[in-house]
Swiss-Prot record:
Active site: residue positions: H133, K137
Gene encoding the protein: dapB
Assigned EC number: 1.17.1.8
Organism for this UniProt entry: Beutenbergia cavernae (strain ATCC BAA-8 / DSM 12333 / CCUG 43141 / JCM 11478 / NBRC 16432 / NCIMB 13614 / HKI 0122)
Annotated metabolic or biological route of this protein: Amino-acid biosynthesis; L-lysine biosynthesis via DAP pathway; (S)-tetrahydrodipicolinate from L-aspartate: step 4/4
GO molecular function: 4-hydroxy-tetrahydrodipicolinate reductase; NAD binding; NADP binding; oxidoreductase activity, acting on CH or CH2 groups, NAD or NADP as acceptor
Binding site for NAD(+): G9, A10, A11, G12, R13, M14, G76, T77, T78, A103, P104, N105, F106
Tagged with keyword Amino-acid biosynthesis: yes
Lineage: Bacteria, Bacillati, Actinomycetota, Actinomycetes, Micrococcales
Main location: cytoplasm
Pfam families: DapB_C, DapB_N
Catalytic reactions of this protein: (S)-2,3,4,5-tetrahydrodipicolinate + NAD(+) + H2O = (2S,4S)-4-hydroxy-2,3,4,5-tetrahydrodipicolinate + NADH + H(+); (S)-2,3,4,5-tetrahydrodipicolinate + NADP(+) + H2O = (2S,4S)-4-hydroxy-2,3,4,5-tetrahydrodipicolinate + NADPH + H(+)
Record-linked Gene3D superfamilies: Dihydrodipicolinate Reductase, domain 2, NAD(P)-binding Rossmann-like Domain
Annotated compartments: Cytoplasm
PANTHER family in the cross-refs: 4-HYDROXY-TETRAHYDRODIPICOLINATE REDUCTASE 1, CHLOROPLASTIC-RELATED, DIHYDRODIPICOLINATE REDUCTASE
UniProt protein name: 4-hydroxy-tetrahydrodipicolinate reductase
């Protein structure tokens, strides 16, 4: 059965890459390319799944409109907070089996790096995350870095790990980065980059670094297409592509 796909934010870099990937994919049909000013509700009856690569200030409204239209939503736009996720979870729970996937990253290497970091975290005394992106990215830290930090914190909490050592008493504002559930996260914005992340885990006398580098947006497309094909089998709200993988 052919899956009918709409792309929201189709004029953007990720949106246009996604639209082309859908055109080229077997078993998928691109039925709409939606941009600012277009009516999302008009997709009702035309699309089975919509992929959202828009902006943080509109993506939640887009998801609610898609759910009202009976359309599964695959969301790659970052900037989501717990309140917004809670509202979407409540809404999708009132639908007849629709699914919403909010994925901080569709790169398979990034998804695996997040999983590896969570698995390793209980065995190390310290962990910090450094994310590096192009200077046009509008949110910091990245959704990937936040998701990574939360995974580390959850794993350490489940293992009963003690607080991470840090004797810093004075620092310039921001010098030690943001704190996500007790994990320090640092955001760099440099021209020439696309998307990169380093996860540093250490013990006395040793350091392990998990690094993932994205050089081209095409690297996200296998994950996006996987999500489009699998979302109907995952009703409700899912955060993170790893839930769709057999890990």
């Amino acid at each position: 059965m052919t899956i009918r796909v709409a792309v929201l934010g189709a004029a953007g870099r990720m949106g246009s890459t996604t639209a082309q990937a859908v055109r080229d994919a077997e078993g998928l049909e691109l039925v709409a390319e939606v941009d600012a000013g277009d009516d999302v509700a008009a997709l009702a009856g035309r699309a089975d799944v919509a992929v959202d690569f828009t902006l943080p200030d509109v993506t939640e409204a887009n998801v609610h409109a898609l759910l009202d239209a009976g359309i599964h939503a695959v969301v790659g736009t970052t900037g989501w907070d717990d309140d917004a996720l809670g509202r979407v979870s409540d809404h999708v729970g009132r639908t007849a089996g629709l699914g919403v996937l909010v994925a901080p990253n569709f790169s398979l290497s990034a998804v695996l790096a997040m999983r590896f970091a969570a698995q390793a975290a209980p065995y190390f005394a310290s962990a910090e995350v450094v994310e590096l992106h192009h200077p046009r990215k509008v949110d910091a830290p990245s959704g990937t870095a936040v998701h990574t930090a939360r995974g580390i914190a959850d794993a350490r909490g489940a293992a009963g790990s003690p607080p991470m050592p840090d004797a810093t008493e004075t620092a310039l504002p921001g010098a030690r980065g943001a704190v996500v559930d007790g994990v320090r996260v640092h955001a760099l914005r440099l021209e020439g980059l696309v998307a990169h992340e380093e996860i540093l885990l250490s013990n006395p006398g040793e350091l392990m670094t998990i690094r993932t580098d994205t050089f081209d947006r095409a690297s996200f497309m296998p994950g996006v297409l996987l999500a489009v094909r699998e979302i109907a089998d995952h009703p409700g709200l899912t955060v993170g592509l790893d839930a769709y993988l057999d890990l």
